[in-house]
A protein has these predicted regions:
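N-terminal Rossmann-like NAD(P)+-binding domain of SDR-like oxidoreductases, especially those catalyzing
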Residues: 1-128
Length: 128
């Protein structure tokens, strides 16, 4: 079984990667290292999973349709766990367009890639 986990370098995403690797899945992680909190923290979150031969990491943005096409074209995912999003209620008030672009349009890109590649299972967690 193969799973794509977006937001893989975040706290929840990195733990999801660990769980699915430990459960025998092949895991592809995707994250853009958004600066909501330190990149070094996120890199540390991925330290353990990057040691696994069942893990492949892609650095990039869910708004990048060509990147998503490449990732989906090169894999046959059974499941997508979509955790990537701009988080934080207060900052969203001052940057509505970017939050909308990432959280709505980025999610639509994931859904479209899933549709095109016939991936039927999605676990989606909303940002705060």
């Amino acid at each position: 079984m193969k799973v794509l986990i977006t937001g893989a370098a975040g706290f929840i995403g990195s733990h999801a990667c660990e769980h699915f690797i430990d459960s025998g899945y092949q895991v592809a992680g995707l994250d853009n290292f958004d600066d909501f909190y330190s990149r070094s923290i996120k890199e540390n979150n991925l330290k353990t999973v990057k040691e696994s031969d069942r893990f492949v990491f892609h650095e990039g943005d869910i708004r990048d349709e060509s990147l998503l096409k490449k990732i989906f074209d090169n894999n046959s995912f059974d499941l997508v766990i979509h955790l990537a999003a701009k988080a934080g209620v207060r900052p969203s008030i001052y940057n509505v367009k970017e939050y909308y672009d990432v959280n709505v349009n980025g999610t639509l890109n994931i859904l479209e890639a899933m549709r095109v590649h016939n991936v039927k299972k999605l676990i989606f967690a909303s940002s705060s």
